[in-house]
Design a protein with these regions (language model features):
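N-terminal glycine-rich phosphate-binding loop and ensuing alpha1 helix
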Residues: 1-52
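A structural signal for short hydrophobic beta-strand segments in well-ordered beta-sheet cores
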Residues: 10, 147-150, 197, 208
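Well-ordered alpha-helical segments embedded in enzymatic catalytic cores
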Residues: 18-22, 94-97, 196
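Residues at the starts of beta-strands that form the adenosine-phosphate
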Residues: 32-34, 133-134, 205
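Conserved beta-loop-beta/alpha segment of the NTase-like Rossmann-fold superfamily
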Residues: 47-152
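Catalytic-core segments of class I nucleotidyltransferases/pyrophosphorylases
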Residues: 106-110, 115, 120-128, 140-143, ...
């Protein structure tokens, strides 16, 4: 498995890391400021951005004159902040550690291993319209995930375990959060998908944006090939 050699978001699809594909998709909707939570083999991510032009452009190295020329130089309109969130920190703890970087406005949140054709602007507009703390994207997929119990208006009442392909909705991983979400995360050992989301649902502060289009989570080599 490639994930033993590099962080999962840096596994390549079409000669580009899945992280790059996710960022390019967000950028299409005008989201160009990124905060990336680093952990396992974080230097791989840092080196990718430090040498970004080497990965994306044609380059001439003049060894005799110790110089380098970058051809067809294209700069992404991105501002990328890389944060060391710890090697063994759980998902909730990683979110908690970026508190000082996100400001006081709602922010988008996603994982580094999933691709979808979600309308991100519509997702943000839905989040701002209901006034709750958190919005997750609900997708219908026959795989091994916990599922959502939600009302017609998108209000999530609870989570439960999925036993078979019964048409249940799952958290697709594309989310919008208000800073109030940090109050639901205790510390480094907190798993974001457990107590924080469950308590948000219990308090009536968790909503779901339904997505019926493409969605794929790359948990296995087979899913990468798909």
């Amino acid at each position: 498995e490639e994930s033993h050699l590099k962080p999962k978001p840096m596994i390549e699809i079409g000669e580009k890391p899945i992280l790059w594909h996710i960022m390019k998709y967000y950028s299409q909707f005008g989201y160009n400021e990124f905060i990336i939570c680093l952990g396992y083999k974080q230097y791989v991510v840092k080196e990718f951005f430090a040498d970004y032009f080497l990965h994306t452009s044609d380059v001439t190295f003049d060894l005799a004159n110790n110089s380098m020329k970058v051809h067809n130089n294209y700069s992404e309109p991105w501002k990328v902040t890389l944060i060391d969130t710890g090697l063994n920190t759980m998902t909730g703890g990683r979110v908690k550690r970026i508190r000082d970087y996100v400001g006081n406005e709602p922010f988008m949140l996603t994982y580094g291993d999933g691709l979808a054709n979600i309308d991100l602007k519509a997702l943000e507009e839905f989040h701002r319209s209901h006034g709750k703390i958190a919005t997750i994207t609900a997708v219908n997929i026959g795989q091994r995930f916990g599922v959502l119990d939600l009302e017609e208006n998108g209000k999530i009442n609870s989570f439960r375990e999925k036993n078979d392909d019964d048409g249940s909705l799952i958290n697709g991983g594309y989310m919008v959060m208000n800073p109030g979400v940090f109050d639901y995360i205790e510390g480094d050992s907190t798993v974001f998908e457990q107590e924080p989301l469950r308590n948000l649902a219990k308090d009536g502060e968790l909503m779901a944006y339904r997505h019926e289009g493409f969605w794929k989570c790359m948990d296995t080599q087979r899913e990468k090939q798909q």
